[in-house]
Amino acid sequence: MSGARRCGGRTSERSSVVGDNRNGYVETDPTGRYGRLSEVLGKGAMKTVYRGFDELRGVEVAWNQATISDVLRTPDALHRMYAEVSLLADLRHDAIIAFHASWVHPSRRTFNFITELFSSGTLRSYRLRYPRVSRRAVAAWARAILRGLAYLHARGVIHRDLKCDNIFVNGHLGQVKIGDLGLAAVLRGCASARSVIGTPEFMAPEMYDECYGVGVDVYSFGMCMLEMLTNEYPYSECDNPAQIYKKVTAGKLPDAFYRLTDADARRFIGRCLVDAAHRPSAEELLLDPFLSPSQNHDDHNIIAHATAPPPPLPLACSNSSEEQEEAAPAPAAKTTDMAITGKLNKEHDTIFLKVQIGGGRNVRNIYFPFDVANDTAMEVATEMVKELDIADREPTEIAAMIEQEIVRLVPGYKQHEYSYADDNDDDDVSGHPNPFYYLSSSPTSSQGSLCGVGSTSSEGFPGPHGKVDWSRDYCYYPPSSVSVSDDDDSSTSSLSAAVSASSLHQQQQHCSASSSRLGPASASASEDGGGGHAGRPRQREGEEERRRRRMSRNRSMVDMRSQLLHRTLVEELNKRLFFNTVGAVHDIGFRDPTAAASSSSSSSHHRRRSSNKIDHKHHYMF
């Protein structure tokens, strides 16, 4: 900032054009060494970058200019601007953007500083301009960035906003350098910073806790590596910062990470994105074999779509043409696009899986729970093939996708076989499911909520990822099946479940025939007139039928708890409604004995009217 102190009095007038101006300057610095041209190289929130020229060295430079009124608009903006200049003035490294001079122009009311010029702009724009880049080149960029981070961290500096937009490229040299240190924090005797600031897509989870260290730059570097390899902005599948925040704090990586087919690249990026306690330093990452110049990094196609990509992918592609030719001489039929994603409910130890089938307008989203303790991937995959009429995928292939998602959500999960022979005590051997199961109030239950108390709205059912567009028929108990009796003499109201055993059994049979673990039957199936349909096999008798019925049961603990809670609430409500609730409320507090007799008749009439209102309200709730 010595340059700023040099500016004052008449010396500032030299900031106008000096000499004969054959270079076409718009203005010059106070010393006349640097001249600004009219060409704009970039524009940020606080500053504009112009092309400039250093007459002393005969090289082009970047002229950064900010209007003082804009800088002084907020104290934070002023602090960030001066912090960037002061840091750049103190840092000297071949991976950090070089700083030359700074000053204030009083009459123009601008703050100016000169940095080295990068001919190819930012790394992000450079990468978009040239989509095909070898892994060898990406590894060279990564080594330069890590060396710059190691230099900053050794001096107690956290960048806090490292991203490809803040990394600059000299394309003719293949050289990258770290810039834009406006958000950098200097740890002066403190091991952690305590402010939440940066770009959400590149912010480490611990930054939201407002207590972090230099490891946040390593996390951001991992996201930069992901963008360099995939040419895709991290968390581009999210629509707003709130969704990004939820994913980051939940430890969910961007979808682009799972589209990496290079196992070594995925391993290297994964090291950068682990939790802060296990995250390596920049110096440690420099020793990773992935960055070794001796490695043969000649792969141009880093990104490839696998047949069964790990979730949470929104789409998946079929096998490549080369794999199909090796598998069989005849061209293989196109497989159904399928992706399986999951969401872990840690509170209830339950996993909800989402199956996305097809693409475009024909996409189908199906949600169902997976009980880690009782379900197996192979059983669920077999049921999916039968229920969803998947003819071009093997159950083993789908089971591998399911198991891969379960392992991602529950790292310690190990696949096992479950015997349904031990479950005879839970299911009726006659084949009749528990009637209370169909009264489940859990909104996430795939079968209980379909056949339980509900509305006939065709808008769909809420799933773990939002609304499921199931505009198809499903079973429910209408409100008329719950009756309310009113006794005028006793002024009591009672609620009773007036569903007969025979009608309940018929409804259960209809529900069992039209829905399963994977959701309700399709509309086309309901029009077949009772016959079998493409998505469901014919009914089988004996042990196999009982086994299939047991498989379709939702074994999720959340459903069991919601069922018990629902039954407890119904029983408690039935008990309380047998008492004179309205009258009891009226009798609370002091009551004049002399007025009791005169108001008994009117009070009794009022209680009858109130009781009718309360009963109607309970009827509406159920």
Swiss-Prot record:
InterPro entries: Kinase-like_dom_sf (IPR011009), Prot_kinase_dom (IPR000719), Ser/Thr_kinase_AS (IPR008271), WNK_Ser-Thr_kinase (IPR050588). ATP binds at T115, E116, L117, F118, K163. Residues 35-291 form the Protein kinase domain. SMART domains: S_TKc. Residues 491-527 have a biased composition (Low complexity). Residues 1-30, 316-336, 418-439, 482-559, 594-622 are annotated as: Disordered. The active site is at D180. GO terms for biological process: intracellular signal transduction. It catalyses: L-seryl-[protein] + ATP = O-phospho-L-seryl-[protein] + ADP + H(+); L-threonyl-[protein] + ATP = O-phospho-L-threonyl-[protein] + ADP + H(+). Its EC number is 2.7.11.1. Transmembrane segments: none annotated. Keywords: ATP-binding, Kinase, Nucleotide-binding, Serine/threonine-protein kinase, Transferase. One of its GO terms (molecular function) is protein serine kinase activity. It comes from the Eukaryota. Pfam families: Pkinase. GO terms for cellular component: cytoplasm. It is an enzyme of class 2 (transferase). Disulfide bonds: none annotated. Residues 604-622 have a biased composition (Basic residues). Belongs to the protein kinase superfamily. Ser/Thr protein kinase family. WNK subfamily. This is Probable serine/threonine-protein kinase WNK7. The lineage of its organism: Eukaryota, Viridiplantae, Streptophyta, Embryophyta, Tracheophyta.
